[in-house]
């Protein structure tokens, strides 16, 4: 699957490369699991509602979430830092 990051999500991903390699590793594990299992698997996948309907969330840590949508053969990542 292609991994497409929004500009903000890419900046957040680069932030983790500098600030915390363990969180970066967890993000990469979640992305690999999304490729394998879609909207099920590790990180407690949760369908989002309201203005984020159509997107899914997975726990990176208690504080941070990976927010994404699967569209065809692409994973569209809109956030990997903070909480929706």
Identify what each model region corresponds to:
Residues 2-4, 8-25, 29, 42, ...:
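Enriched for short, Lys/Arg-rich terminal
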């Amino acid at each position: 699957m292609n991994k497409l990051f929004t500009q903000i999500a890419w900046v957040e991903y680069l932030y983790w490369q500098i600030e915390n390699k363990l969180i970066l590793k967890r993000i990469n594990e979640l992305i690999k699991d999304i490729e394998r299992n879609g909207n099920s698997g590790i990180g407690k996948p949760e369908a989002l509602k309201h203005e984020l309907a159509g997107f899914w969330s997975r726990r990176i840590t208690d504080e941070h979430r990976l927010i994404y949508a699967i569209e065809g053969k692409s994973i569209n990542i809109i956030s990997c830092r903070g909480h929706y």
